[in-house]
């Protein structure tokens, strides 16, 4: 018995003195391993009488339990010390100044779109939307561009399945709106992405347009000039901005015109196209051209963004260069 008590006392003392997990595991192996001291005592029980075996065996098991309890307590203490050391090493210094997150910003083309919509909304125009994949009727035929019409050669079009196309302009939105509206007055602005096979410093295969439409009794070309001139002067915040309407041709308007503004270099700069809605277009959407007239215009939002922010290469808007885009943070 005394020998058992001595061995377990030495083992518990060694456990309590252990400084790390490796030392602790070595002590456990020395006392409870296959060849450990307490394990060896159990092997001697076979040499004892039944009465001694019962008494001494129970005592040895009790000592093993005491050793295991001491071992578990020391292991938990080492784990706690390790955790506290880690927390101390990773502690946050709440006296340090905070690091502010950089705020995001809207894309310059989006800012331009918002400005255009805001200005036309103030004139009583509402925003209309439509699908980017269009059928032949809405993208061409309803706009007075029938099959084999020479004007189709003006459009380098992306065709998809079943003869559908990626819309080449936002004019199909106007067609859909008038077909749904059934009866004028119609006064809408139709912004969105459009697609044409073109790519250089001033053109992109995907770009953004905004088209306006006003159909009502008594609408004239003078109304078109007044509305667009007021818009573009307010957009560029220049009341003295010179605007001219130059005769042109579009199959969906008659008469048609290109819109130019005077640049800072003293040269005219084209910024859009417009005209009075062609009678055939009105007929295609079940509106009586004898009773109603209307005008339509279209502008390139990317081009307006280039002019507004003095950007020379359209492709910069789509390169996702943060150094470039951060310039437009409000």
UniProtKB/Swiss-Prot annotation:
Catalytic activity, as annotated: tRNA(Phe) + L-phenylalanine + ATP = L-phenylalanyl-tRNA(Phe) + AMP + diphosphate + H(+)
Entry GO terms, CC: cytoplasm
Annotated localization: Cytoplasm
GO molecular function, one term: phenylalanine-tRNA ligase activity
Protein's UniProt keywords contain Coiled coil: no
CDD domains associated with the record: PheRS_alpha_core (cd00496)
Highest taxon, organism lineage: Bacteria
Record's keyword annotation contains Manganese: no
GO biological process, one term: phenylalanyl-tRNA aminoacylation
Record text on cofactor binding: Binds 2 magnesium ions per tetramer.
Binding site for Mg(2+): 254
InterPro entries associated with the record: aa-tRNA-synth_II (IPR006195), aa-tRNA-synth_II/BPL/LPL (IPR045864), Phe-tRNA-synth_IIc_asu (IPR004529), Phe-tRNA_ligase_II_N (IPR004188), Phe_tRNA_ligase_alpha1_bac (IPR022911), Phenylalanyl-tRNA_Synthase (IPR002319), tRNA-bd_arm (IPR010978)
Keywords: Aminoacyl-tRNA synthetase, ATP-binding, Cytoplasm, Ligase, Magnesium, Metal-binding, Nucleotide-binding, Protein biosynthesis
Cofactors that this protein relies on: Mg(2+)
EC number: 6.1.1.20
Sequence similarity: Belongs to the class-II aminoacyl-tRNA synthetase family. Phe-tRNA synthetase alpha subunit type 1 subfamily.
Oligomeric form and interacting partners: Tetramer of two alpha and two beta subunits.
Xref: NCBIfam families: pheS
Listed name of the protein: Phenylalanine--tRNA ligase alpha subunit
Species, as recorded: Neisseria meningitidis serogroup A / serotype 4A (strain DSM 15465 / Z2491)
